[in-house]
Amino acid sequence: MITGKELRIISLLTLDTVFFLLEITIGYMSHSLALIADSFHMLNDIISLLVALWAVDVAKNRGPDAKYTYGWKRAEILGALINAVFLIALCFSIMIEALQRLIEPQEIQNPRLVLYVGVAGLISNVVGLFLFHDHGSDSLHSHSHGSVESGNNDLDIESNATHSHSHASLPNDNLAIDEDAISSPGPSGQIGEVLPQSVVNRLSNESQPLLNHDDHDHSHESKKPGHRSLNMHGVFLHVLGDALGNIGVIAAALFIWKTEYSWRYYSDPIVSLIITIIIFSSALPLSRRASRILLQATPSTISADQIQREILAVPGVIAVHDFHVWNLTESIYIASIHVQIDCAPDKFMSSAKLIRKIFHQHGIHSATVQPEFVSGDVNEDIRRRFSIIAGGSPSSSQEAFDSHGNTEHGRKKRSPTAYGATTASSNCIVDDAVNCNTSNCL
């Protein structure tokens, strides 16, 4: 069944195809570079709409499998990056042609026809703006952490895919801990009974509470694109750029048609350069945002340092390492972290609950926490290896380095960090007991 998003894309695709053929034909007939530039922008819109249609289709119809364990949730992100790259390439080609026209201006034949086509193109783009206007503005995300406020998510599968589950796994075991079992007293909360269970808590409704933590109540105002599609936002930028380009075409055609200045033909390449700037100013931020997601950068709305400090303040946690936070899509955040614990395994349950609570408070509802239990006699050694502790002050580990960053043996050594492997050889971090020395084993 065709969704509302697909119907809008198909409608705009049909309209753009008609006007692309019209603009490129009239543009070459009248030698109007502005109209030709706008027609190629329209062609890129057609390509981007095809990519958007494909992205929506695969995101809706292709679920996770053995080959793609996350499914095709990033299909629209990839489509947005392709759109942006095409636009940036188009900018350079138009700019070169416009500079040539500034050196050797060409006479624009039949500017009145160019004007009519520009007006018709503007009307078509106004229709496109009405189709996609919901995707053009950043939404403010404000909520109390007892619940998540429902937003208007245009893609049905995205609201279904927004879920909450955290895994706390013991070394040698890929087993999830049931949060309810952790919080419940008595025998059901014992580690031997909850480790065999693998429970994923999914949100059936976005307005349901994520986790009961009444002691933490504050609001966020951030430009979090959680309720809109990055690729659909890219389509909106295409349409907006086209509309502004049509206004430039109309202005240049009127100026050439109604004036007799000898330099009036310079208005055509000048308008073309303005169109190029408009396209580039929308394409570059889009490419950066899509690239950050595909490169698994830390989301701009999340402070990894703050999360780390809060986790280090949890009782029993002495150090953290291999901490990663990234976007799966614009609205789904994922995190993984290794936590070194100085308590017994059966006491880890309360710490795991607090750690998951911290992730929930920061909007991360899919997290993997791997505990590493250490005995008391090596706690002090571990503390010396980490320079970041709760509160953000440097630990005693810095005493092992001189002012030049050398160790007591005179060798250069990188200060430990929570965001990478704790050993210089980057050994396997799945399980220290197996003594894996493969450098790329993560």
Curated annotation (Swiss-Prot):
Ranges per topology, Vacuolar: 30-32, 97-112, 257-265
A Pfam family hit: Cation_efflux
Annotated Basic and acidic residues bias: 212-224
Cytoplasmic-side segments: 1-8, 54-75, 134-235, 287-442
Induction and repression of expression: Expression is induced in zinc-limited conditions by the zinc-responsive transcription factor ZAP1.
Keywords (A to Z) from UniProt: Cadmium, Cadmium resistance, Ion transport, Isopeptide bond, Membrane, Phosphoprotein, Repeat, Transmembrane, Transmembrane helix, Transport, Ubl conjugation, Vacuole, Zinc, Zinc transport
One example GO MF annotation: zinc ion transmembrane transporter activity
Compositional bias annotation for Polar residues: 149-170
GO terms for cellular component: fungal-type vacuole; fungal-type vacuole membrane; membrane raft
InterPro entries per UniProt: Cation_efflux, Cation_efflux_CTD_sf, Cation_efflux_TMD_sf
Renumbered ranges of motif Histidine repeat 1: 141-145
Tagged with keyword Iron: no
Crosslinked positions (Glycyl lysine isopeptide (Lys-Gly) (interchain with G-Cter in ubiquitin)): K357
Reaction(s) catalysed (UniProt annotation): Zn(2+)(in) = Zn(2+)(out)
Short sequence motif named Histidine repeat 3, residue ranges: 216-220
Biological process terms in GO annotation: intracellular zinc ion homeostasis; response to cadmium ion; zinc ion transmembrane transport
Coiled-coil blocks: none
Consequences of knocking out this gene: Reduces zinc transport into the vacuole and hence limits the over-accumulation of zinc caused by the deletion of ZRT3.
Extra facts: Present with 8200 molecules/cell in log phase SD medium.
Described function: Vacuolar transporter that regulates zinc homeostasis by mediating zinc transport and storage into the vacuole. ZRC1 senses zinc availability in the cytosol, which might be performed through the histidine repeat motifs, and transports zinc from the cytosol to the vacuole if zinc in cytosol is abundant, conferring resistance to zinc toxicity. Plays a role in resistance to zinc shock resulting from sudden influx of zinc into cytoplasm when ZRT1 and ZRT2 are induced in response to zinc depletion.
Recorded domain comment: Contains 3 histidine repeat motifs between the 4th and 5th transmembrane, exposed to the cytoplasm, that may be involved in the binding site of zinc.
Protein name: Vacuolar zinc transporter ZRC1
Gene: ZRC1
